Amino acid sequence: MKIYLIIIFFFISLFSYYSQNTKEEIISELIVDYISSKYSKEKLDNFIYIGLKRQRLYLFEANIISKIYKVSTSIKGAGNEISSYKTPLGLHCIYEKIGDNAPIGTLFINKRNTNKIVKIDSLYIHQNKDEITTRLMSLMGKELNINKGGSVDTFKRGIYIHGTSNEKTIGQPSSHGCIRMKNNDIVELFNSVDKQIPVFLFNN
């Protein structure tokens, strides 16, 4: 009887493993197909996809999802205009990576390391707290007159993927335009990607 239970457990575990893999592969294919249809000239391989309505960041390696992170985008929704405090949409790339080897909780102001460590609050929501912590990666728009140039320039707006001292808000819209992540997550992502990696932001 015991051996039968072990065999049944083995096959259930095996089924769960392949079911999960199949699910991720299906999601990967759907996202890759969607991006390819919108950006047919863009060669896809390693890239970041951010879904604003999902409040999720997907890291793709070789066109397969390798990591999924909860994020927090703008409390005001999606938009590309300067001074809108909205999260921009479209094709971007990571232009700068700042904060390598900085301790968790390091405070950054105007992309400079202040050498101060702030408290990471994972218990309470502070809507007005907008501290940039641990790591930041600035985004540059790649689409002229959509997120690059004039009054819609993402880089001039100072839009980053960054850590936050207000981790309780992760998973719900609460930022002033940037993409916030938990501090351990931003370190992992920072170490996993290179500058110029494509970043696709969609309101879905």
What function would you assign to each model-found segment?
Residues 2-4, 14-204:
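N-terminal pre-domains immediately preceding structured catalytic cores
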Residues 6-10:
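Hydrophobic helical h-region of N-terminal Sec-dependent signal peptides
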